[in-house]
């Protein structure tokens, strides 16, 4: 998968109806394309990414997690530091939708039922799928195939979360 959704800023809102065993929330961050078109910088968010998240907290140390992220990916060779890419002049813009399921592991106990403030670093991994349009470059143009495909990946996310109040959790990934 040639996309990178990075520097995610998550705002997770615990659900009151489930005694904080389940969490629902949203997040916003940045995205950028990593590939053979555009910038050669690995972390260089240039478009907005946003999505939703659901978690089932099985214990103070782990949770099952599902998320959906939407973003527009774009790349422009003229903005690259590579003179060959600048000379070539390719560019593209496309909308992508990513879905992910997996396991989140807390390095410290993160008990949502505790009355005291909690904080912990965490690790998330699982499987993700991105739906994207298919296209190819000719020597002068970007040509759409008018079809879409799925790409699969294994996300590895390191984050930190803390309780802001009894029902609000703030997390950074």
Annotated model-derived regions:
Residues 18-57, 134:
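Short glycine/proline- and aromatic-enriched beta-strand/turn motifs that initiate or cap beta-hairpins
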Residues 22, 61-64, 111, 166-170:
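Repeated loop/turn-to-beta-strand initiation elements of outer-membrane beta-barrel proteins
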Residues 118-173:
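Outer-membrane beta-barrel transmembrane domain signature
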Residues 26, 52-56, 101-105, 125-129, ...:
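Residues on the lipid-exposed face of transmembrane beta-strands in outer-membrane beta-barrel proteins
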Residues 20, 44-48, 95-99, 119, ...:
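Residues that define the transmembrane beta-barrel architecture of outer-membrane proteins
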Residues 62-138:
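Gram-negative (and chloroplast) outer-membrane scaffold detector with strong preference
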Residues 34-40, 84-92, 141-146:
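Extracellular loop and loop/strand-boundary signature of outer-membrane beta-barrel proteins
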Residues 1-24:
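Bacterial Sec-dependent N-terminal signal peptides
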């Amino acid at each position: 998968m040639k996309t990178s959704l990075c520097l995610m800023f998550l705002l997770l809102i615990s659900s009151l109806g489930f005694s904080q065993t389940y969490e629902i929330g949203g997040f916003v961050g940045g995205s950028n394309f990593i590939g053979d078109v555009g910038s050669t910088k690995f972390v260089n968010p240039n478009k907005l990414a946003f999505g939703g998240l659901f978690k089932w907290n099985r214990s103070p140390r782990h949770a099952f997690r599902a998320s959906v992220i939407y973003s527009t990916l774009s790349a422009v060779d003229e903005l690259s530091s590579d003179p060959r890419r600048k000379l070539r002049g390719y560019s593209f813009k496309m909308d992508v939708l990513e879905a992910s399921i997996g396991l989140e592991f807390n390095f410290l106990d993160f008990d949502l039922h505790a009355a005291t403030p909690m904080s912990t670093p965490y690790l998330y991994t699982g499987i993700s799928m991105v739906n994207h349009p298919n296209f190819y470059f000719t020597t002068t143009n970007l040509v759409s195939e008018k079809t879409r495909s799925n790409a699969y990946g294994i996300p590895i996310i390191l984050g930190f979360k803390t309780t802001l109040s009894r029902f609000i959790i703030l997390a950074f990934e």
